[in-house]
């Protein structure tokens, strides 16, 4: 039995067949307020359902593929994981659930790279669907795990199978992570979590350089506190200020992965190079944020 197969078996045994949280979370989400952005209507429930999909969606690999330059998609249908390839080893962004790590490893290998060449592991925010698998990735590859300082306490509370969550480097807003000539900048875009991290980098394709933004979730809690309200106001302002040619996110639906991948397979211009869509997700989430605030104010909440 190969090492990846053994690890897959072990993960299933440790985690068991329990249902993914998406169904319970979606059922607990309100179907109001409703906002309409670019002709489409959204509610808190529909946004979460769009992001998480079904339990099967969360674990089924999406076809691994090149996005642009040295950036590749290696995640599932509804949970993004990105591979940044460099001559000195690779950077993985978002391990997702621990049970998905062997799947991500296989996607990396299908692209012709070695999962063992993962030197750095980054994440967008301290929720299990994005960073629960960090300890297993480190166990398999020895990668250095780096995270925004504000999210470290929540990350360390994640202990799948009793594993301690590794943190090799705590990052601050604006710090750079560099490997093999590629630099990613950690941008604090708090609100969804205290250390929600949007990553920016540059990619080359066809003799041109493009600005790539990998968004952390911009989704507001249904009853944001004054502190979270202040954080999200700063975050939306910041996100709108970032140079962007290619917008990615921690859930594929946030940047229309399926539609863009279908166009990519047809040939022609790279559909991921789409500056006009860079703020679409911010528009949706900011509209919902203000609608939630209006409801909260109407109900007499602080």
What are these regions (language model features)?
Residues 1-4:
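N-terminal secretory signal peptides that target proteins for export/translocation
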Residues 22-89, 298-302:
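Zn-dependent metallo-beta-lactamase
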Residues 25-30, 275-302:
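C-terminal regulatory/interaction regions
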């Amino acid at each position: 039995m190969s090492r990846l197969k053994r690890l897959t078996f072990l993960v299933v045994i440790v985690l068991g067949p329990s249902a993914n949280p998406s169904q319970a979370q979606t059922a607990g989400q309100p179907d109001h307020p409703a906002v309409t952005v670019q002709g489409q209507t959204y509610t808190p429930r529909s946004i979460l359902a769009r992001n998480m999909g079904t339990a099967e969606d969360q674990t089924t690999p999406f076809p691994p593929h090149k996005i642009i330059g040295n950036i590749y998609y290696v995640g599932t249908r509804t949970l993004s994981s990105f591979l940044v390839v460099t001559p000195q080893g690779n950077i993985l962004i978002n391990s997702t659930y621990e049970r998905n790590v062997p799947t991500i490893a296989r996607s990396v290998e299908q692209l012709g790279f070695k999962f063992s060449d993962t030197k750095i592991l980054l994440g967008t925010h301290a929720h299990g669907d994005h960073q629960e698998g960090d300890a297993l990735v480190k166990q398999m590859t020895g990668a250095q795990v780096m995270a925004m300082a504000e999210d470290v306490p929540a990350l360390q509370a994640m202990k799948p199978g009793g594993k301690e969550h590794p943190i090799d480097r705590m990052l601050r807003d604006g710090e750079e992570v560099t490997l093999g000539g590629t630099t990613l900048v950690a941008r604090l875009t708090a609100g969804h979590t205290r250390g929600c991290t949007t990553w920016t980098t540059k990619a080359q394709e066809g003799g041109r350089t493009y600005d790539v933004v990998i968004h952390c979730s911009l989704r507001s809690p249904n009853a944001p506190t004054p502190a979270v309200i202040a954080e999200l106001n700063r975050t939306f302002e910041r996100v709108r200020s970032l140079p962007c040619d290619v917008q990615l996110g921690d859930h594929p639906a946030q940047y229309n992965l399926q539609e863009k991948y279908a166009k990519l397979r047809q040939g022609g211009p790279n559909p991921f190079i789409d500056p006009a869509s860079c703020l679409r997700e911010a528009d949706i989430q900011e509209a919902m944020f203000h609608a939630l605030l209006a409801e909260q104010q109407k109900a007499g909440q602080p």
